[in-house]
From Swiss-Prot:
Pfam families: DXP_redisom_C, DXP_reductoisom, DXPR_C
Reactions listed under catalytic activity: 2-C-methyl-D-erythritol 4-phosphate + NADP(+) = 1-deoxy-D-xylulose 5-phosphate + NADPH + H(+)
InterPro entries listed in its UniProt record: DXP_reductoisomerase (IPR003821), DXP_reductoisomerase_C (IPR013644), DXP_reductoisomerase_N (IPR013512), DXPR_C (IPR026877), DXPR_C_sf (IPR036169), NAD(P)-bd_dom_sf (IPR036291)
EC number: 1.1.1.267
Domain of life according to the entry: Bacteria
Entry function: Catalyzes the NADPH-dependent rearrangement and reduction of 1-deoxy-D-xylulose-5-phosphate (DXP) to 2-C-methyl-D-erythritol 4-phosphate (MEP).
GO MF annotation terms: 1-deoxy-D-xylulose-5-phosphate reductoisomerase activity; manganese ion binding; NADPH binding
Cofactors required: Mg(2+); Mn(2+)
Family: Belongs to the DXR family.
Name of this protein: 1-deoxy-D-xylulose 5-phosphate reductoisomerase
Keywords carried by this UniProt record: Isoprene biosynthesis, Manganese, Metal-binding, NADP, Oxidoreductase
Gene: dxr
Organism lineage: Bacteria, Pseudomonadati, Pseudomonadota, Gammaproteobacteria, Chromatiales
Annotated source species: Nitrosococcus oceani (strain ATCC 19707 / BCRC 17464 / JCM 30415 / NCIMB 11848 / C-107)
Amino acid sequence: MIGVSILGSTGSIGMSTLDVLARYPERYRVQALSANRSVAQIYQQCLQFRPSQVVMVDPDAAEQLRQRLHPVVPEIEVSSGSEALETIVTSPDTDYVMAAIVGAAGLLPTLAAARAGKRILLANKESLVMSGQLFMSAVSESGAELLPIDSEHNALWQCMPAEGRELPLHRKGVRRILLTASGGPFRERALSELDNVTPDEACAHPNWSMGRKISVDSATMMNKGLEVIEACWLFDAAACQIEVVLHPQSVIHSMVDYVDGSVLAQLGNPDMRTPIAYGLAWPERMESGVTLLDLFAIGQLTFCQPDLQRFPCLGLAYAALERGGTCSTILNAANEVAVQAFLDQRIQFTQIPKLIEWTLGRVTPTVADSLPAVLESDAVARQVAKEQVERWY
């Protein structure tokens, strides 16, 4: 039995992972679950999957869960705090780690899993955005297996040669990577109307079912910008080798353009259970519960270039990548502050890129050669961004 620990089991990726795991009880065992404070939801997950351990980041939520579980399944160990997350992913009973915590909060436990040599199903792109060099070094040194779960990077993984994955793109005969993006809910909205976009509108993605933070990132296309940075680290690519293509149908999840003129694409319905099942079963494949792709119903696939006036966050991400050091960390921190401020209705949708650009101009990046350096840049950028939100609000 393969022991699977899920970081962020109550989020959309975590729930999709459990849906896939439930189909194979003879092959996978849910070793540990974690959440921030969603007690009712994780309680139901505990009743169904009976993990050995559960971690609630919030101590009060952990105590509530402990009191609810003890009369029913007293054998489940409930703990709290960020350090407990590192404990479950490094446990000898954990073979695979689904890294699905959203944002910078997922960095430390995911890095711990890499250092422990686990198979990591990486849905937390911020781990690579913030500490790409450190993270990839940890994977290499420990012999960990790193499988991308973002649909785009999983598609690229499937379209790349199976041999020599560690080689740079030109050694694999790859000319460029084509990352597809839906364009989110506002790809055709008049620019003059974007000031008045509400959080609920921004979270209504036309194709994917996602959490609120990543839905806003999709609407601004910062999500695609972060994915560009992630792809650079995963595939040893330069920024100039990655092109973003708007593809509203979200059927082609990404493409690889080879030097001989061949372009390989991975297609499928927009359902995260596909890359999750691929990561769990690799190098094999297994049924995931995803609906059969009906090309006749889709009819046509369309593509266009992204408009950087409409999506300035994408340009900011490329600029941060080119600048190097902890600039990507600063970008991510400012974005997390900006998105939360927008969701809290403290700033406008169009102020998200303005706050990020403002923060990038005021926080000096350093060399990203240690975890303390990365965390320091993250903390400084958050403080600077939060102070500016207070001035605007």
